[in-house]
Design a protein with these regions (language model features):
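Conserved N-terminal segment of class I S-adenosyl-L-methionine
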Residues: 1-96, 106-108, 123, 199-202, ...
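Residues marking the start of alpha-helices
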Residues: 93-95, 112, 171-174
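Helix-loop segment at the mouth of the active site in Rossmann-fold oxidoreductases
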Residues: 97-99, 116
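A short SAM/SAH-binding and catalytic strip from SAM-dependent methyltransferases
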Residues: 106-117
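S-adenosyl-L-methionine-dependent methyltransferase catalytic module, highlighting the catalytic core
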Residues: 117-125, 131, 135-241
């Protein structure tokens, strides 16, 4: 009898959690990235030639182009968003950036670096194509995002998710690998100077709590209590970028 009652309670909890933890839509993802892009633009030089790494559908590249930047975009052929592209995205092997040395004044990525398994080696490629006085800006999922994704995933599917990125063996140790401190150490060890840091000031998870039913304004407020879902880093390989950011 007790076992039956417990199963009934668990089914009820799962039913409720499935309602609140919805499937993520592209429209919701675009709303989040649009808000984040507003923060990014405040941290970038006002003009320049931009390379977006991991461009997905290409709509962030398009948005940057519409704001006066000269934008090129790259992504791997197996990108989940390849079928929904709205902008010209060059496919590459994920290791070698298909551009000449000193081509770009700005390198931009959003929720991309964590998916690169040879992340330290890849920094050499970013250094190579970046002009000496250029900046790199990366938006990266945070420890808070990882923690709350684990919790919401558990509530919805009754299991812990696998690691989201490439550095950690599982989603529990990934909480550390997504920390601000881990990225700061990696960037410094690979020849970068950290010019500025910020957060995206939004709360969301990989399990998509309420999707677009929880608006951006409320997600902004929740981030003050539950933590921001992404960290933002502006990097340079020379002191000359200080006066531009």
């Amino acid at each position: 009898m007790k076992t039956f009652a417990l199963k009934k309670v668990l089914r009820k909890i799962r039913s409720v959690s499935t309602f609140w933890i919805a499937e993520q839509t592209l429209q919701h993802l675009e709303a989040i990235r649009t808000y984040e892009l507003g923060i990014v633009l405040d941290m970038l030089p006002p003009r320049g030639r931009v390379l977006e790494i991991g461009a997905g559908t290409g709509w962030q590249a398009r948005a940057l182009e519409n704001r006066g930047y000269d934008v090129s975009a790259i992504d791997i052929a197996s990108s989940n968003y390849g079928a929904n592209r709205v902008w010209s995205v060059t496919e590459y092997d994920g290791k070698n950036i298909p551009f000449d040395d000193n081509t770009f004044s700005i390198i931009f990525s959003s929720n991309t670096l964590e998916h690169i398994p040879y992340i330290s080696e890849f920094q050499k490629e970013i250094h190579r194509v970046l002009k000496p006085n250029g900046v790199a800006l990366h938006v990266l999922p945070s420890s808070s995002w990882c923690l709350w994704t684990n919790i919401t995933y558990l509530l919805k599917w009754w299991t812990i998710p696998t690691a989201h990125g490439e550095s950690a063996k599982n989603s529990l140790t990934e909480i550390y690998y997504f920390s601000r401190w881990w990225w700061v150490r990696l960037f410094r060890e690979t020849g970068w100077k950290i010019v500025a840091q910020d957060s995206n000031r939004l709360f969301y998870t990989g399990a998509s709590i309420m999707d677009s039913n929880l608006n951006i304004s409320m997600r902004n407020k929740l981030s003050c209590v539950l933590g921001s879902s992404c960290n933002i880093f502006v990097l340079s390989s020379s002191d000359e970028a200080d006066s531009q950011v």
